[in-house]
Design a protein with these regions (language model features):
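Hydrophobic membrane-insertion alpha-helices, especially the h-region
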Residues: 3-22
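Low-complexity, intrinsically disordered short peptide segments enriched in small/polar/basic residues
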Residues: 6-12, 122, 135, 139, ...
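Ankyrin repeat domain, specifically the short helix-to-loop turn at the C-terminus of the second helix
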Residues: 49-54, 80-91, 114-123, 153-163
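Long amphipathic alpha-helical segments
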Residues: 87, 102-105
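Extracytoplasmic/periplasmic C-terminal soluble domains
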Residues: 132-164
Length: 164
């Protein structure tokens, strides 16, 4: 790393320490974008250097869920969703905006779908918005709006489906 880069990082961290924004503010900056003085990357640098306090984990637990974190920008969504799960939060917890696996199916996001299954999302959990599990939901989505991604999701879910 060049001396200029090291100096810039130290300067940014010094300003962060001097003005001391709350960690919750820095978390939102890192997740959603810039705040008055700092870019999202600068806020991420703070956490990369100092780590996450219990306040940050509590903020994540109380104000976010996997589905909302997976709606962040592509470069941040898996990072924060994993941080949420690493703190012991349940990927299969029923939430107001629906189950994350249903959201991935609806968004036609194959990468997110695979990520959720890898993290033990349970396709048999019934989503309270649709009153369907992921198996039935994918069947309906294929009828209403078939896509190559949804056809792939259907194949994958057929392998997960418990035999009757």
């Amino acid at each position: 790393m060049s001396k200029k880069t090291i100096f810039a990082i130290l300067l940014i961290l010094s300003v962060l320490i001097i003005i001391r924004p709350k960690e919750e503010t820095l978390l939102r900056c890192a997740m959603f974008g810039p705040m008055k003085l700092f870019s999202s990357d600068t806020c991420m640098a703070y956490f990369n250097v100092f780590g996450y306090s219990e306040n940050v984990y509590q903020d994540l637990r109380e104000n976010f869920d996997v589905a909302s974190l997976l709606s962040l920008s592509p470069e941040r969504k898996y990072y924060f969703a994993q941080l949420y799960l690493d703190n012991g939060n349940d990927i299969n917890k029923k939430i107001d905006q629906g189950m994350p696996i249903h959201s991935a199916i609806l968004k036609d996001d194959l990468e997110e779908f695979y990520w959720l299954l890898e993290k033990n999302a349970d396709p048999s959990v019934v989503d309270h918005l649709t009153d369907l599990d992921a198996y039935d939901f994918i069947d309906i989505m294929i009828i209403k709006q078939p896509t190559p991604n949804r056809l792939e999701m259907h194949k994958v879910l057929e392998r997960y489906k418990p035999s009757s």
